[in-house]
Amino acid sequence: GALALAGCGGVGAPQHIDITLIGFNDLHGNLEPPRQSITVPGALPTERVALPAGGIAHLAGAIATLKARTPHHAVVSAGDLVGASPMVSSLFLDEPTIEAMNQIQIDFNAVGNHEFDRGWRELLRLQHGGCEKFTVREPCQISQPFAGAQFGFLAANVLREDGQTLLPATGLKRFTEGGAQVTVGFIGMTLRSTPSMVTPAGVAGLRFADEADTANAQAAQLRAQGADIIVLALHEGGATTAGATGITEPSCTGPSGDIVPILERLDTAIDVVISGHTHQAYVCDYASVNPQRPFLLTSAGQY
């Protein structure tokens, strides 16, 4: 999904800078199209049109189209980029998916539970590259050596025994136009219950902290670093009663799921929440549910 953000400029600068924020989630290494479609509004008020969707070619084309609309954009994945993948990716330890994302030039991926399927050491290899073997499969079967992700994995609530995060908690991206500059801060994290979903050995020595507490603490730090807009990419999700029409229903009707208690505790400094995990599609103004939480809530379904 994509949305437009407007950031204020300084004195004598343009009143705002238009920024396109492109978010997706739960790709699960689906490089080949799954022969699925999405239903979107047609030319007439009652018309619905089925568009082919899924697979890396459709995703890359959609992202390129959205990027072309404005010189200012950011692309963020809300987790499960890899893991539980079809053989075309999993046979090669999901290196093909990472390399595809490098070609698309995404900016950040918030880790999800499936990023830990092969253990945290293999996750670090996907980020940093190299051919060290941590699994039964051989790494670097395609690219030798494997260079790793050219985008940042974010894991704000995944802590080592010394209290340091396994991967960076946040990232910043700055946009300038004329004399104006807008800084967007990104927080990325997985769901706290990740250890119950993966092999214990794969997360040994790690602690998964509370999502809302972590997001609020990081939001304060990002504001101190000069962030004008804060985006939370959270691999946790829910659903709305809008169902399949969630991408065109702006009111967040009947929100449910494990993400809701987290949303209710988020600091108002957070402007956008890109969610995932439940493979549901919704783009809505959460202020319609709770006026004290006026952020945009999105999830792009799945591959």
Please name every model-derived segment.
Residues 1-7:
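N-terminal export signals
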